[in-house]
Amino acid sequence: EDVDKPTSLNHLSFRVKTFDEVQEVKERLDSIDVQYLPLCHGNALSLYFNDPEGNGLEVFFDTPWDVAQPQGVVWDTNLTEKEALEWVERTFENEPKFAKREESDREFVNRK
């Protein structure tokens, strides 16, 4: 097999349990001057960045909502968790299928 052959892998994603963990990653990236893209999909607050070899990475925290995808809006990483979640709700509440996760009618949203 040709190990140098490009793959279709775009990035690796890592779910964290708390908003504070996203903030910890942000602070670490800031401390070592790594650029990142803070992107909100409505259902998650994410940080996208590259590792030293250029592989795409995402660290994300689930929001309490489900939103039809694709979505992507840059979010302010200086917000507190409460402010960020209020911003998410205001930003995405008029999008198709916006609902609390537990009320979502999409089967895969609440799978464990």
Q: Where do the language-model regions lie?
A:
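Polybasic, low-complexity binding patches
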Residues: 71-77
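Zn2+-dependent peptidoglycan hydrolase active-site motif and core
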Residues: 2
